[in-house]
Amino acid sequence: RDQPRSRGLGDVYKRQDSKNIYDFIETPPNKEMGDYAFPCFKLAKELKKAPQIIANDLKEQLVFENNEITKIDIAGGYLNFYVNEQMLISTVLKEIEKSKENYGSSNVGQGKNIVIDYSSPNIAKPFHIGHLRTTVIGNSIYKIYKFLGYNCIGVNHLGDWGTQFGKLIEGYKRWGEEYNIEENPIDELTKIYIRINNLCKEDESVLNDCRNNFKKLEDGDEYCTKLWKKFRDLSIKEFQRVYDMLDIHFDSLNGEAFYADKMAEVVQILEKTGKLVESEGARIIDLSDKNMAPCIIGKTNGSTTYATRDLAAIMYRAREYDYDKNIYVTSYEQILHFKQVFEVAKLLGLDEKYTDNLIHVPFGMIQSKDGRMSTREGNVIKLEDLLNEAVSRVETIIDAKNPNLEDKKEIAKKIGIGAVIFNDLYNSRIKDEVFDWDTMLNFNGETGPYIQYIYVRTKSVLDKSGYVPKLESINFEKLQDKKSLEIVKLIYNFGEIVKQAAEKYEPYILARYLISLAQAFSSFYNENKIIGEDQQVQDARLYLTYATGLVLEKGANLLGIKMPQKM
């Protein structure tokens, strides 16, 4: 967002990039110390002056246009700036009136393409809790970048290829009639897979049959391809139920199989570089000069690896989408894999625009309060079961607190699923997420339900008053109390917060901000009578209530959370 403009900075700026200067500006920890602070020690080394002297020089030279800054203080080596509060209130509320639900958006990404590769479950296997984080973090990054004007391409790079399909085809040939895969595809296919896998361990010839099936599939055999397509379509249909619950949509489902015929080109290009060498039964690119283990491109039996498929995907995406960034949202366990792939991608002859903008966005594990997440039998927890459990727990809470609530099921869905999403996004993604129902569904904690509760409160205040005042009727002076100003300043920062979340690929920056805004409104609501005051005060406070609700709803939407209208 625009910082106050100044002129007449003399020599101090001459060798300083204005972007650097802008990045140095901080928000003081204590509100009494001003609205912005500039740490002069950041210039001390280059200017060969003490921070205190730089602060004095700057204070004398700075001239602000339009009286945007009313006071500048020096504290230690800091310059502290105090904004013109009435001007700030007027600027923020006029912008809200003009932009409405687009408030905080930007066209900074106009004309730029961003590929975001996330979720990516395996066909014919359970869509489990391990896929929650990539799905939720990826979706939020997608929405945030879209809000900033980027053209986003969300890719669900499905695990739909590999030797396991040879086994599934063999199992289905033998016992397909015994299983109802149309009705319950993933559970039934899992049973077939376990059964054929056990048989392979006992009988080498069955394993050979499975390998032959996959070879046939690779060669385009009609029967094997038809079965593979059936398994894939049924799995996607089942995955879609979960995506519908989370309201997530993809622009492409090109997964592993899509690149099966595109890997030969990668291997050819790498062969021409002379860097593809044989080693211990594999074909590798040596990365010892980068202090990394070698990147395995193929096995001697001719089969390819994940790395080869990822390299083929990079080439395809560069050509198809002309991307400005290609982002991968996966677990931190894949950090080395992507470092290797991104290094080898530099050998593919692609423009640096593509190879310099490959970005891995890693995240930590999910743990319950007492360790890793799994059921009593050691099976993984299905994501659909987890989301249904969240909804049913919220229904129980609603029954206890507000049994006559209309649309109970729909509201419980928004709160329960919102709670799961918010819990996932509330901390920096690299930290392991602790999964604890009581914390997550606490309506007074730093949670999704708390933000929804405060949003619903803004709606009920406006419903009670029966109107949203017109901006021209607002007397901005009526919002200069401490609690109102705190909200105005937070709303002013919304666009900047969204940009930071995008730059760092960290939705938690936005999640934390929404908690601060909700808490500020709660405090304002508890200390101020909104309806029934003097008409000018009422109109000003109602408009601020409307603005708060607007930003809470938009911010939650960027995290992938829907707001209920009642609770």
Which residues does each PLM region occupy?
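Non-catalytic interaction-recognition regions
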Residues: 1, 11-89, 100-101, 105-567
